Amino acid sequence: MHRGKGMKFVGDSRIPAEKKPNIPKDYSEYPGKTEAFWPNFLLKEWMVGAVFLIGFLVLTIVHQPPLERMADPTDTGYIPLPDWYFLFLYQLLKYEYAAGSFTVVGAMIMPGLAFGALLLAPFLDRGTERRPWKRPVAVGMMLLAISAAVFLTWQSVATHDWAKAEEQGKITKEADIDTNAEGYKVFKEQGCISCHGDNLQGGAAGPSLVDSGLKPDEIKKIAVEGKGKMPAGVFKGNDKQLEELAKFISETTAK
């Protein structure tokens, strides 16, 4: 057959590329079902975030932070307390089975099991259901964790001595202490330093003696008879030492 013989041209078989302009979808066709991410959805997110941010800034301005005195690593009477979101773990470490020789159990094993269960939760419950009563494993683990954290936090708050914690962290005035004074030597020899601090700044066991506002006779009476948590008979010195101690404390004032 010669070239072209017996063939008939019927038209162009190529498919033309139809170019359409990139027109955004008209969301009015689906009222209440969908919307544009920008700016409709994102603007709502920003507005909610702005409300929380402004509220947080107002709280930081209105309420002063609960600052305590400068940390002193030599103060063995200070009882530290974690922030509220760690109170449940703080309370857990108080129990016999999670403290002492079992500290590893309370500090490592139990939290490790809890976080391990949290990581395994997506693999333990792979269902497509969204109703809580049809997801017993995930919902049960969540309720158990929340209940335990709430109970331990409540126990920690209820059993903690907040008045003592406030007293031990109170910011006290500084004073120039003459460590060569006879009154300070008596103060140190009689063991007053263990409760009231080496600079008379006070602590968890005793109040600050700086700017006490007490007269020497009042100080002598307290040293002999005691007051509040201070028992009687703590002072073991003679009358001269008592006089020096009372004079020293009454004259100790802040800068």
Swiss-Prot record:
Keyword Electron transport annotated: yes
The Cytochrome c domain, residue ranges: 178-253
Entry keyword set: Cell membrane, Electron transport, Heme, Iron, Membrane, Metal-binding, Transmembrane, Transmembrane helix, Transport
Main location group: membrane
Binding positions (heme c): 192, 195-196
MF terms in GO: electron transfer activity; heme binding; iron ion binding; oxidoreductase activity
UniProt topology in membrane: Multi-pass membrane protein
Segments passing through the bilayer: 46-62, 104-124, 137-157
Annotated compartments: Cell membrane
Cofactor: heme c
PROSITE patterns (UniProt xref): CYTB_CTER (PS51003), CYTC (PS51007)
GO CC annotation: plasma membrane
Subunit structure: The main subunits of the menaquinol:cytochrome c complex are a Rieske-type iron-sulfur protein (QcrA), a cytochrome b (QcrB) and a cytochrome c (QcrC).
Record's function text: Component of the menaquinol:cytochrome c reductase complex.
Sequence similarity: Belongs to the cytochrome b family.
PANTHER family assigned: CYTOCHROME C-553-LIKE, MENAQUINOL-CYTOCHROME C REDUCTASE CYTOCHROME B_C SUBUNIT
Protein name: Menaquinol:cytochrome c reductase cytochrome c subunit
Organism from which the protein derives: Bacillus subtilis (strain 168)
